């Protein structure tokens, strides 16, 4: 072996390996339709995300991607690579946004005059993404006007084991603004290591009483010049029931494996 361990054919030796899986560095993605099989229930039983964002048209507080689920001290924190940058934190927008633009946690808005905690309920007039006039460096999961101040909840959970954990963010029975009898339930799942994003849509209603019912399901980079959306779901009128989609980086997963000898 390259590290100098020599093995004798008549000797029993025990080998172990450390596998290091760095985040991917790609800015290219593909979209896939996948079977509708949510990894957990939408009302997860842990209301952590409500503490981060539980109001109408507001950004929550910056949070660790393993918020409420601290790992073993010997296990790295949950991180996610998004357009070539690795993030340990994010911030939730009440209208279906997950933003990695947290360097200025008091001003997550394209319109500072509206107030720095204001999560704009509509940017549809700016057109489809990619678009510098829309929220950037974020996941639109989907992005449209939901009103959590009158009902519903946002749930958060980490499932699985390192290095294959999943961060689940679930928008559960959120009333549509101007159509409060219509309830939206959907979740976004982030995979560490592979940096895959999955969307599970139990029910995404259409409310044409507000902004003609326009909504966007996809991602956009920090510059606003690259974006990926589900076909037909880019600043358009669409509804979904029991659908699932995946956005995954293009390219092979890179890893490093270090072998070492240990005693029996």
Feature map (PLM): residue ranges:
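Extracytoplasmic Ser/Thr/Pro-rich, glycosylation-prone low-complexity segments
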Residues: 1-264
């Amino acid at each position: 072996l390259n590290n100098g361990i020599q093995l004798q054919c008549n000797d029993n030796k025990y080998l172990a390996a450390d596998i290091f899986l760095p985040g991917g560095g790609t800015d290219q993605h593909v979209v896939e339709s996948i079977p509708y099989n949510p990894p957990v229930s939408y009302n997860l039983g842990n209301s952590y995300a409500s503490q981060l964002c539980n109001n109408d048209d507001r950004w929550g507080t910056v949070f660790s991607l393993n918020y409420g689920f601290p790992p073993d001290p010997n296990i790295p924190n949950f991180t996610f690579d998004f357009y070539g940058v690795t993030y340990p934190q994010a911030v939730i927008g009440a209208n279906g946004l997950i933003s990695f633009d947290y360097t200025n946690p008091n001003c997550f808005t394209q319109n500072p005059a509206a107030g720095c905690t204001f999560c704009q309920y509509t940017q549809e007039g700016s057109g489809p993404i990619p678009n510098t006039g829309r929220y950037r460096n974020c996941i639109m999961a989907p992005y449209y006007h939901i009103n959590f101040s009158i009902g519903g909840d946002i749930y958060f959970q980490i499932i699985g084991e390192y290095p294959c954990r999943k961060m689940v963010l679930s928008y559960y029975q959120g009333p549509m603004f101007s159509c409060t009898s219509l309830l939206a339930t959907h979740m976004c799942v982030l995979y560490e290591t592979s940096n895959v994003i999955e969307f599970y849509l139990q029910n995404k209603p259409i409310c044409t009483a507000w902004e003609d019912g326009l909504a966007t399901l996809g991602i956009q980079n920090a510059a606003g010049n690259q974006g990926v959306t589900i076909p037909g779901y880019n600043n358009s009128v669409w509804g979904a029931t029991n659908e699932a989609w995946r956005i995954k980086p293009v390219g092979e997963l890179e890893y490093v494996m270090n072998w070492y000898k240990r005693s029996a």
